């Protein structure tokens, strides 16, 4: 695990975007695992800037998003499909057939989850996976005490996650209580992983994930076992880390 501590959110975003650009330049048909939420928005803006400067080509890139709220259709502004189109896909030359996001309105969740795993396998696995980390240590929507053997599945969101995500909705009551998420096993099979975190609110989760014991209660702690993880965090998120 390589840990890069930067001064602020902007530098974190630039560093992550540069690493994604390098991946795509080296392997134009890269399979990218993408995340949503506040943390990667700056990274996506930086990627768009790189693309506009003709230094990045998305025409052969394939993407798989980590998760999607269950019960939200794609037109809902709070859906992660809407988020991805607005923050990245509408601004680059990606083939829409190469975009993969779980269907939050699927009639049969079990089939949807198995098909998502099949698509990842058929693509050859994820070359580079982007992750954020929740205040409770979750990655994707894999909440504490999730099995490390889990694949794409339907998740019951816990109270802390619902509370944290309520800032994106008009009220806490509007936040979906379930989501479809790639599982820990799905994530850990990625060839390379970049974990992003910014701000003091994430410092405890970051410290437990990196310095603590590998424990299903802190899902991100499983990353300690991965052979190629880069953690890019600002000074506030790193404030409780033991970097010795």
Curated annotation (Swiss-Prot):
Family matches, as SUPFAM superfamilies: NagB/RpiA/CoA transferase-like
A matching Pfam family: Glucosamine_iso
CDD domains per UniProt: GlcN6P_deaminase
Identification of the protein by name: Glucosamine-6-phosphate deaminase
Functional summary from the UniProt entry: Catalyzes the reversible isomerization-deamination of glucosamine 6-phosphate (GlcN6P) to form fructose 6-phosphate (Fru6P) and ammonium ion.
Keyword terms of this UniProt record: Carbohydrate metabolism, Hydrolase
Organism, as annotated: Clostridium botulinum (strain Loch Maree / Type A3)
Family: Belongs to the glucosamine/galactosamine-6-phosphate isomerase family. NagB subfamily.
Known EC number: 3.5.99.6
Listed PROSITE patterns: GLC_GALNAC_ISOMERASE
UniProt GO BP: carbohydrate metabolic process; glucosamine catabolic process; N-acetylglucosamine catabolic process; N-acetylneuraminate catabolic process
List of catalytic residues: 67, 136, 138, 143
Gene Ontology MF terms: glucosamine-6-phosphate deaminase activity; identical protein binding
Cystine connections: none
